[in-house]
């Protein structure tokens, strides 16, 4: 999806047009389409996709730019009991980093960059993952309230008991916070929400138990089919049957010693399963389809030929998918809103962007900085204090 930025005031129309053209370029620079696709798989499978919207000062040869990336939920920690992650008192993003790389980046703390303040859970890999020379780096975001009542977002980075950076210790951020928007730089896209937690559950959690029953029933049905189609015999020890010839179906003759009767060799009778068990297995499959909203009308199965009936069935079958997509669009709006706030805060230098033209294959260049979207002084109060106007934009 591409954002459309709309102004709330007439004076901001030009800035809104520029943002509508520039935001897709910034998303493209961040390979957002791949991140969006990867996170959709996470959302479908595990119920939650986590996006991080940061300012990366190392981008653009040190000029800095917006950085949008996927966050692993195993490395994200929040206050228990909150449903909205923005209401959490603290937010932690942890990562395992090689100690030698940390010493190169922070040489003043050499010898003090080992330790694990947080136990980082890991996935079960086929390969052996060595974490002996890695340390847990914690990015800690927390909110405070200024004297004027404004919510400030502060940021600290530490390893073990060694503090690497704290925005409250930096005069540039002490009074304004790390990001001016005052929000945690994390956006969660939830599949099926739950009370008391900002994350949800996905299709794996929904379909796991029905699939276990389906697998067990199918296994038993297949086992019975194999037993029924493969003949076995009770053979008396006194029966002189050439077993090699008996087991080799390519030989027309099987030699025996003595007489053969039902007392010396007898086929083992295997009773086939009733049709009811196949019906039960099919019912469980249909149940899982209903639970997962994976109906035949969504995949174009035959059976209904009237156009109006097909449209009605598809409309009814798409309710779940429409809500999933709408939730991702709402997440997309939050991500782009954070991008606008980072542009407002950090785009002091004019930058050039190539945007798509009106005709196919055409393009043009536009220049942009944050002069038109920063807070603008519009007057003074009776006490002589300046009054500021902040341009606000809506995203569609």
Where are these regions (language model features)?
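Extended alpha-helical, oligomerization-prone segments that build pores/tubes and scaffolds
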Residues: 1-396
């Amino acid at each position: 999806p591409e954002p459309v930025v709309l102004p709330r005031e007439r004076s901001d129309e030009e800035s809104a047009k520029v943002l509508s053209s520039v935001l897709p370029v910034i998303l493209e620079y961040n390979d957002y389409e791949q991140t969006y696709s990867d996170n959709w798989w996470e959302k479908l499978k595990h119920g939650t996709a986590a996006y991080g919207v940061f300012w990366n000062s190392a981008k653009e040869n040190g000029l800095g730019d917006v950085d949008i990336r996927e966050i692993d939920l195993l490395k994200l920690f929040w206050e228990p009991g909150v449903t909205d992650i923005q209401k959490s008192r603290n937010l932690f993003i942890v990562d395992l980093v090689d100690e030698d790389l940390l010493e190169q980046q922070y040489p003043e703390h050499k010898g003090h960059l080992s330790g694990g303040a947080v136990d980082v859970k890991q996935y079960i890999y086929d390969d052996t993952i060595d974490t002996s020379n890695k340390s847990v780096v914690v990015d800690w975001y927390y909110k405070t309230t200024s004297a004027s009542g404004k919510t400030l977002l502060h940021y600290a980075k530490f390893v073990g008991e060694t503090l690497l950076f704290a925005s409250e210790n930096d005069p540039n951020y002490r009074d304004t916070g790390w990001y001016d928007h005052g929000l945690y730089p994390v956006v969660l896209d939830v599949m099926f929400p739950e009370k008391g937690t900002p994350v949800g559950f996905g299709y794996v959690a929904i379909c796991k138990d029905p699939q276990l029953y389906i697998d067990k029933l199918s296994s038993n049905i297949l086992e019975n089919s194999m037993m029924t189609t493969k003949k076995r015999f009770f053979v008396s020890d006194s029966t002189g049957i050439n077993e090699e010839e008996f087991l080799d179906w390519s030989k027309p003759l099987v030699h025996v010693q003595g007489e053969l009767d039902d007392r010396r060799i007898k086929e083992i009778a295997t009773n086939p399963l009733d049709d009811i068990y196949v019906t039960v297995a099919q019912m469980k499959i249909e149940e899982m389809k209903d639970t997962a909203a994976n109906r035949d009308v969504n995949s174009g199965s035959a059976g209904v030929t009237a156009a109006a009936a097909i449209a009605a069935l598809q409309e009814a079958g798409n309710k779940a998918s429409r809500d999933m997509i709408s939730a991702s669009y709402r997440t997309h709006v939050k991500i782009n809103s954070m991008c606008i706030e980072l542009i407002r805060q950090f785009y002091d230098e004019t930058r050039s962007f190539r945007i798509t033209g009106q005709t196919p294959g055409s393009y043009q260049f536009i220049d942009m900085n944050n002069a038109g979207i920063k807070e603008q002084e519009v007057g003074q109060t009776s006490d002589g204090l300046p009054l500021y106007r902040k341009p606000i934009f809506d995203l569609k």
